[in-house]
Structures are given as C-alpha cells and as structure tokens.
Amino acid sequence: MASDFLPVRRALLSVSDKTGLIDLARALVARNVELLSTGGTAKAIREAGLPVKDVAELTGFPEMMDGRVKTLHPLVHGGLLGRAGIDEAVMAEHGIAPIDLLVLNLYPFESVTVKTDCTLADAVENIDIGGPAMLRSAAKNFARVAVATDPAQYADLLAELEANNGQLSAAKRFALSVAAFNRVAQYDAAISNYLSAVADSAETVPTRNPFPAQINSNFVKVMDLRYGENPHQSGAFYRDLYPVPGTLATFQQLQGKELSYNNLADADAAWECVRQFDAPACVIVKHANPCGVAVGAGCGDAYELAYATDPTSAFGGILAFNKTLDAATAKAILDRQFVEVLIAPDYDAGALDYATKKANVRVLKIPHGNGLNNYDTKRIGSGLLMQSADNRGMSLGELSVVTQRAPSEAELGDLLFAWRVAKYVKSNAIVYAKDSRTIGVGAGQMSRVVSAKIAALKAEEAKLTVVGSVMASDAFFPFRDGIDAAASAGIQAVIQPGGSMRDGEVIAAADEHGIAMVFTGVRHFRH
C-alpha cells in the first residue's frame, strides 16, 4: 500500500511547453531536489542558472537519431517503475536511482496536425515515443512517483510540497496519475484519428477522410447533473476536449441553480438558433423547439416580439440573445415570466444586478465566437450515427422562384428569416413569419399539413394575424394540402426545398391561391 506522504528528492523534467518551467525548476532546486532533464528543457534550465543533469549523463548513452532516442533506457524507466519496499535490491544491483517526480508534456502533435498545410512527415515527427512511455511508467507507479503533464498543475504541486515539507500525498499522486493516463489516451487518440483519416500516405499534404475507419472521442466531464432527461435517469455533462469557440460548451454560469440535462439540451437549441442572426435577436425554446423568434431594434424589442408568438409555451422556457442583455430587457423578462435559463454573449451590470432578485434563474454567458461544429452525432443501440453538421446557410441569390408571382422584397426578407428558424424546429417543421418575427410554429408532427394547421392555431391563440405572412417548410410538400391549408390561413409566400414527385401539383396550388413560392434545393430535417 502506498505511504500517504513521500518526499520528492529527484525529478526528471522534459517538456515541449516551457510555460512555468523555470519557476517550477527554481522552486524544486530551492528544496534541494536534484534535477534531471533532456535536450531543450535542460538547456533552458541551465540558461536560467540552475543546476541540472542531462539524462545522457545519467544513462551514459547519448541522445541520437535527431532526438528520437533519449529516455528509452532502464536507468530512466527503472527509476520511475521501481517499487518501494520491493525493488530496492534490484535497483542497487544495477545502479538505478529512484526518480520521485516526472514533469513532462508531449510533442505538440494536436496543434501541428490541425494546420491545413501539415505534411505527413510533419505529423510523424511530432509523434512522441519516449514521452508517453515515461508517463505510463510514472503513472503506473503512483504508489511512489508523482507525474505532472500540464503547466496548469504546477501551482498546486508546489503548494502541496510547501505545505508538507517537500512531500506529496498519496491522494495527489493518484490524481496526477489519472490525469497522466488520460493525457496519454487523448494523445494516442489524436494520432489514431489523424492516421486513420489519411487517405494516401504518398501525398505530401495528405487528404483526410472526414469519416475514417476508426474514431476515438475524448470528452471531459464538466459537471454531474441532478438527473437525466427524467428523474429516474442519472446524468452528467461532458464537453469536447477542444470545444469550438462560441458553442454552448464554452458557457460560464453567472448565477442560478445547477443546470439540468434538459436545460442544456434546450440551451443548445436556443443558442445555435440565435447566433445565426446578425441583428439583435431573441429565441425562446421549449422542449428543444423554438416557440418564439424575432429580430428587433434591440434585445427588448426582439424579446417582446418573440414572446408574443406563444406566451403560454414561453413560460419556463430558455431565452437566448445574440447581443449584450441590458437591464431594461432583463427586468421586462423576469417581471413577466418564469424563466429556466437566460443566455447571452454578455450582460450589462444592471441586468446582472436585477437577475439576482430571481436567484434561481440560471444565467449563462457564452463568449462570441464564429466557430461551427463540424459534425453531428447520435447514439443508437451499440452504434453511433455521424454526419457533417447542418451549417448550410441560404442567400437570396440561391432561391428559385417557381410560381407565377414572385415574392416582394419584404416577403423575401421574411422568407429567409422563416427559413433560418425552420432549420431549428423539429421535423415536420412549419414556421409562419412576418416582419422578421414568428407568427406561429408547428413542430414535430408526423404529417406536414398538420404542422401547418398547428402553426395557424398557435397564431390564432396568440391573437396574431396570419394574413400577409410567409411560410417556411423544412422539407418538401408531398401533396398540395399543405399549400391549401396555408392559403386558408392567409399565407402569401412560401419557402421550401422542392423535390417532391408532385412539385407540379404543389406549384399549381400556389398559383391558384396567388401565393409566391421559392425553392431552396436544401432540406433541413431535424430529429
């Protein structure tokens, strides 16, 4: 069994990232810790005026093959793997001295291979061999050895040494061991993912298959959740190892109760929808569906218009804004309705002050970022569905007018607005909109015509006028009945992908009703 506290007398430092190296080395030397090192790390320590012994001097074997072979030696690995109370005699027989602390980070394979001009040779030269081997040796022997893999760990490491007269606890050694094995797993996964995606080893800058023969995913736990989608399910939230800037996983919670599984799922839907707009916008989401979306002169205006779409569904909803939330809008929201989560790229001081009056409201800040997820995944029984993310936009120039009447300029603007919203509504999705605000949303129905009828019903419940509005459909109309239902509600223009066997009948129906219709040639199913 591991002793609780063990002293650090000898440390091996070998790092690619020199952040914090000299401060760490200086603190260790001040505690009379003997330093061993390699290559550029030893050079940096020596130039700082600190004593250090080269590993080559220890092993009696020089670094060779342009640094490919440096630490793969029994005097190094024996010093890391030797067990207290078991291996002392063998170590003494072979002149192996124990190493108590390993500080090591790996060649920057991930940051090199993310570059678009990375050659296969560049990638291969940044595959670390000796580093992972040492990490595994040290991490396996956490009963005696401590291992640090990240400059972010140095401060806590030194603090524990300071607090315990140069010793590290068993708990600290074990925690560092787990982190080291995680780092090795992440590193090996990155190498496997890269090489599995390389289509042709003969290419200088190889083409990468977006769907390689094997994928290895790494996620880091952010938090445990109160429960999963339902109270009888347990749950936790994990983020990508390298989250895309501007996506939900980069959030900072400023106040409120702990987040639930459903909070996060709904927050992601709301945030992804609102961040596609340039002008001030508000999106209100319930059960992963937008129930109100609007663009306005400011956050307050956008909120009022979005809320008016469906005040009933907005109760207990998730509200997302794409601009800094001001105090007046925060007050209007919190005085009017129960809110589960507020999301914005930032908040002014007054908004945050007022939010504290509703201490349970979860307030999330997500920094601006233009990054987009490259892939969507969905778990099925013992399998994973993977696809490129639906990041397809739409511009006026891509629309095809298929009816006798072309949409007016105002209708075109509303059509594109409704199309953007429909992309985030569960299929079958129908969105009625006018003046850059939703009038009614029909979501998740097995029949497209029923979704159209629901959109009209929601508008009627909210006492909003459908006449003169436009309609967006996430997929084509298989029959003319959807157009007939829209016409009876007062819809004047329609945007849809087209592509049905009965497009001719659908277009004829639109012409009969004097409806302008455009095809996008793009479908936005969402399940």
From Swiss-Prot:
Its EC number is 2.1.2.3, 3.5.4.10. It holds the Pfam family MGS. The keyword Transferase applies. Pathway: Purine metabolism; IMP biosynthesis via de novo pathway; 5-formamido-1-(5-phospho-D-ribosyl)imidazole-4-carboxamide from 5-amino-1-(5-phospho-D-ribosyl)imidazole-4-carboxamide (10-formyl THF route): step 1/1; Purine metabolism; IMP biosynthesis via de novo pathway; IMP from 5-formamido-1-(5-phospho-D-ribosyl)imidazole-4-carboxamide: step 1/1. It comes from the Bacteria. GO terms for cellular component: cytosol. Residues 1-149 form the MGS-like domain. One of its GO terms (molecular function) is phosphoribosylaminoimidazolecarboxamide formyltransferase activity. Signal peptide: none annotated. One of its GO terms (biological process) is 'de novo' IMP biosynthetic process. PROSITE patterns: MGS. Keywords: Hydrolase, Multifunctional enzyme, Purine biosynthesis, Transferase. It catalyses: (6R)-10-formyltetrahydrofolate + 5-amino-1-(5-phospho-beta-D-ribosyl)imidazole-4-carboxamide = 5-formamido-1-(5-phospho-D-ribosyl)imidazole-4-carboxamide + (6S)-5,6,7,8-tetrahydrofolate; IMP + H2O = 5-formamido-1-(5-phospho-D-ribosyl)imidazole-4-carboxamide. Belongs to the PurH family. The IMP cyclohydrolase activity resides in the N-terminal region. This is Bifunctional purine biosynthesis protein PurH.
